[in-house]
Amino acid sequence: MESKPIVGVITNETVGFNGRQLSHSAGKRYVDAVMNFADVVPILIPACIRKNDLGTLLDMLDGVVLTGGRANIEPHHYGGQAFPNDEVIDPDRDKTVLDIIPECIQRHMPIFGICRGIQEINVAYGGTIFYRVHQQGDKEDHRMPQNDDASLEEIFKPRHQITFTEYSLFKEFLGQDRFWVNSLCLLYTSDAADE
């Protein structure tokens, strides 16, 4: 039997047990997509892996998925203004992912960024982010529904279309120029990285 590629899925550091225990988790929809759509074997990457262990980890992987997450990248990584005190942060993930990205690029290892993951790739190469896009009059509100009783179907339903660039692998793979996607973001790319 032929072995399948192994793809690392970054986790988020979350707080449980009324603030008494930190855990590492990734949304089931990310893991399911990697297993079922991409037909690879997922393994979860802890958000706190030591930098000197990254080489050992990446030697075992064929690619990395940078998931979305509740927390946003801290602004000191891209020269942005400090977040309000109530903003959820994940400093261990910030450090881990910002170390993983250049290692993957150096190895020519595929990286797939989703939501926060796209922002992390941009920041890793010198790009900047604008915070709370919904407060900008000329930008669409991409946040998830704000009502507590919203169903998962409502939260994750497609909200807007994206247009693929001429040489996009997605355009080739899907055989279409546009695609409907969901959007749950507070952030958007302000200045895209040069690389």
PLM segments and residue spans:
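Short beta-strand segments
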Residues: 182-184
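Conserved G/P- and acidic residue-centered "switch" motifs that form tight phosphate/ATP-binding loops
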Residues: 115
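Hydrophobic, aromatic-enriched interface-forming segments
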Residues: 118-122
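A short, hydrophobic C-terminal helix/tail in secreted or cell-surface proteins
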Residues: 191-195
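N-terminal beta1-alpha1 cap of cysteine-dependent amidohydrolase-like domains
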Residues: 1-112, 123-130, 134-177, 186, ...
